[in-house]
């Protein structure tokens, strides 16, 4: 099944909260997730000239703000992080940013999706061409919610997978190789364990 770009938000078997973002693509498969610094992961084309072909293929997908991780599928990463940085509650930062940025104005009206993770709270949100939703979710050890741009743009108990990995590196590999979801390109995981640990693949 092709579900496009997606987020996976959950807890490892040993109880560590994490969020993984995977790029899946038919049109622009030559991209990487690159750790820019301790607070930022960016999605970049391997050939930088490709960034001029589509405004939505290059963006920061991870921003760390203190003890809060913001992970999304687009440029709204920075907007959400900025709103949290100036003191907005997570729910309000998500709502404001998704509502004002709106869905991507491409040929597919691609939804914007987002996850925000702290040591004791987790939120998911999305805005599509016909819906907007923000939800605080309860995480369970060994399970994770997934939220995608296509086919699975909902926040529901029916969109959960079992998770058997415990490190950010293994989680990246697990999500990249998940047989149910087609066209993997690159991924990044942010795991909370006495601070944030970040991996890419």
Curated annotation (Swiss-Prot):
Question: What's one GO MF term for it?
Answer: IMP cyclohydrolase activity
Biological process annotations from GO: 'de novo' IMP biosynthetic process
InterPro entries xref list: IMP_cyclohydrolase, IMP_cyclohydrolase-like, IMP_cyclohydrolase-like_sf
Q: Which UniProt keywords apply?
A: Hydrolase, Purine biosynthesis
Question: The organism sits in which domain of life?
Answer: Archaea
Question: Record's Gene3D superfamilies?
Answer: Inosine monophosphate cyclohydrolase-like (3.60.20.20)
Q: Which residues form the signal peptide?
A: none
SUPFAM superfamilies reported in the protein's UniProt record = Archaeal IMP cyclohydrolase PurO
Q: In which pathway does it act?
A: Purine metabolism; IMP biosynthesis via de novo pathway; IMP from 5-formamido-1-(5-phospho-D-ribosyl)imidazole-4-carboxamide: step 1/1
The catalytic activity of this protein is classed by the Enzyme Commission as: 3.5.4.10
A Pfam family matched by this chain, by name? IMP_cyclohyd
Q: Does the keyword ATP-binding apply?
A: no
Which catalysed reactions does the entry list for this protein?
IMP + H2O = 5-formamido-1-(5-phospho-D-ribosyl)imidazole-4-carboxamide
Report the protein's function.
Catalyzes the cyclization of 5-formylamidoimidazole-4-carboxamide ribonucleotide to IMP.
Q: Which HAMAP family match?
A: IMP_cyclohydrol
Per the similarity annotation, which family is this? Answer: Belongs to the archaeal IMP cyclohydrolase family.
Q: What is this protein called?
A: IMP cyclohydrolase
Organism of this sequence: Methanococcus vannielii (strain ATCC 35089 / DSM 1224 / JCM 13029 / OCM 148 / SB)
């Amino acid at each position: 099944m092709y579900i496009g770009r997606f987020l996976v938000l959950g807890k490892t078997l040993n109880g560590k909260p994490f969020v993984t973002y995977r790029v899946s693509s038919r049109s622009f498969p030559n991209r990487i997730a690159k750790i820019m610094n301790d607070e930022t992961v960016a999605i970049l084309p391997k050939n930088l000239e490709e960034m001029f072909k589509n405004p939505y293929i290059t963006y920061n997908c991870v921003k760390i703000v203190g003890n809060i991780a913001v992970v999304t599928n687009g440029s709204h990463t920075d907007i959400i992080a900025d709103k949290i940085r100036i003191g907005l509650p997570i729910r309000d930062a998500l709502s404001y940013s998704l509502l004002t940025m709106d869905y991507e104005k491409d040929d597919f009206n691609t939804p914007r999706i987002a996850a925000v993770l702290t040591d004791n709270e987790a939120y998911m949100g999305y805005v599509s061409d016909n819906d907007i939703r923000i939800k605080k979710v309860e995480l369970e050890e060994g399970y994770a919610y997934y939220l995608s741009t296509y086919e699975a743009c909902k926040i529901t108990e029916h969109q959960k997978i079992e998770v058997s990995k415990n490190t950010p590196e293994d989680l990246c590999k697990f999500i990249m190789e998940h047989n149910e979801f087609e066209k993997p390109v690159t991924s990044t995981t942010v795991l909370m364990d006495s601070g944030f640990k970040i991996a890419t693949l």
